[in-house]
Amino acid sequence: MARAAVLPPSRLSPTLPLLPLLLLLLQETGAQDVRVRVLPEVRGRLGGTVELPCHLLPPTTERVSQVTWQRLDGTVVAAFHPSFGVDFPNSQFSKDRLSFVRARPETNADLRDATLAFRGLRVEDEGNYTCEFATFPNGTRRGVTWLRVIAQPENHAEAQEVTIGPQSVAVARCVSTGGRPPARITWISSLGGEAKDTQEPGIQAGTVTIISRYSLVPVGRADGVKVTCRVEHESFEEPILLPVTLSVRYPPEVSISGYDDNWYLGRSEAILTCDVRSNPEPTDYDWSTTSGVFPASAVAQGSQLLVHSVDRMVNTTFICTATNAVGTGRAEQVILVRESPSTAGAGATGGIIGGIIAAIIATAVAGTGILICRQQRKEQRLQAADEEEELEGPPSYKPPTPKAKLEEPEMPSQLFTLGASEHSPVKTPYFDAGVSCADQEMPRYHELPTLEERSGPLLLGATGLGPSLLVPPGPNVVEGVSLSLEDEEEDDEEEDFLDKINPIYDALSYPSPSDSYQSKDFFVSRAMYV
């Protein structure tokens, strides 16, 4: 019986040992789809409130059995159980300061949003926190986030009053108090000094105070110069700039003004001024001369010396001495008294006035020229526009109508001499009013007969009864022909002139009487020639 109960190894199915392994792989594959989403870093201000987000993704049918928050060293900060609610086991992280944003102690609902809120953030709250979900049946899923506690510093800058000297000393100080992390301080200056920073604990635990001192060799020219303290911190959207005006104490630097090299005998109310630059301000002014003799007409009035009347005693060297808390400074001014006023100054003044007047006149002339040029250009543009309109439109010249032409007084015909007192016209002007000018074939140019042809035998008449008669030309005939040639030349010149004025006139021109005989059909028999 026992032997029959034991199956031989050869009858075992080869796939049975692989089934547990396959189920385990499928379970792990499904579990890998579930993850915890947290932020890698969260910053919170000291004394403020901050939230640490933590979410279980994606939404599944898995049941969350517990959620816990713990530090990197394993200290449990907060816990939530669907049945037992919220728990804060560490006294440092009490329920007065910590809370779950979505969870409620009275609810046993499934919790997939485990966001934890801190109130009254402390420096010791900074560190790594692990959000852990215990799920069934996939097990535990976790995410780690780093909480950083920062403190915004308070900043101010001030000048350090120093006295002029050969050694480098601190002339300005910039302080950034209570920063976490420490602030970074730099200086912006054109004086070429150097900065030195020191660090000390802040008022609150975990904060730092930075003190930066700007140093240089104090000189008089550094007094009143502005330098800038630049403070950078990650809690600032942009750096903070703090300007500082340096204060360097130095003795008076003195100069004298008011002498114009035109002090002459009899000049009244001449003034010398003692100009002083110092820190602090001078407390005393003293006027004297190098000769030790002070002119009776000169009166010292603080920083000014008033000379009521210039005399030969004023021809000396005046000294102004100024004193302040640091030291004393002095300056000298040589006075040269002239016998009479100098004209150099007047000439210079006149030159200046003349130059100003000349500049005004030149400006006025230039402005006038510009206005004239603009007006001329404007007129030229208007004239060009008018000419363009005239060219585009019909011609302005209108020739006389044929009717008006016919009504003009008839020109005398060319006469030819037949005898001593008889004259007969060869041809009269002809115009057909029924035919338009465009239909008539009018030659523009006419070939005139030569002088020999004009002076040859003349045609006196035509008859079919006998031969033509030849008549030798007499003196009157030759004279008439020459007059006819002159008239024809004048007519040709007039036609050319009219053609140049308006080409349309040529279409309405009429043949002149002098060449009318060329187009008329008649003949004279040879028997008529004399």
From Swiss-Prot:
The modified positions for Phosphothreonine read 401
Extracellular topology ranges: 32-351
Localisation: Cell membrane
Per the UniProt entry, the glycosylated residues are 128, 138, 315
Provide Cytoplasmic-side residue ranges.
373-530
For region Disordered, the annotated ranges are 382-407
Annotated positions of the Phosphoserine modification: 424
Disulfide connectivity for this sequence is 54-131, 174-229, 274-320
What range(s) does the Ig-like C2-type domain occupy? 153-247, 252-337
Residue ranges of the Ig-like V-type domain?
A: 32-147
Q: Which UniProt keywords are given for this protein, alphabetically ordered?
A: Cell adhesion, Cell membrane, Disulfide bond, Glycoprotein, Immunoglobulin domain, Membrane, Phosphoprotein, Receptor, Repeat, Signal, Transmembrane, Transmembrane helix
Q: Where is the signal peptide?
A: 1-31
Q: How does it sit in the membrane?
A: Single-pass type I membrane protein
- Enumerate the PANTHER family for this protein: NECTIN-2
**Assembly notes:** Can form trans-heterodimers with NECTIN3. Interacts with CD226 or with PVRIG; these interactions are competitive and have a differential functional outcome on T-cell activation, either positive or negative, respectively. Binds with low affinity to TIGIT.
Which family, according to the similarity comment? Answer: Belongs to the nectin family.
* Function noted in UniProt: Modulator of T-cell signaling. Can be either a costimulator of T-cell function, or a coinhibitor, depending on the receptor it binds to. Upon binding to CD226, stimulates T-cell proliferation and cytokine production, including that of IL2, IL5, IL10, IL13, and IFNG. Upon interaction with PVRIG, inhibits T-cell proliferation. These interactions are competitive. Probable cell adhesion protein.
Q: What is this protein called?
A: Nectin-2
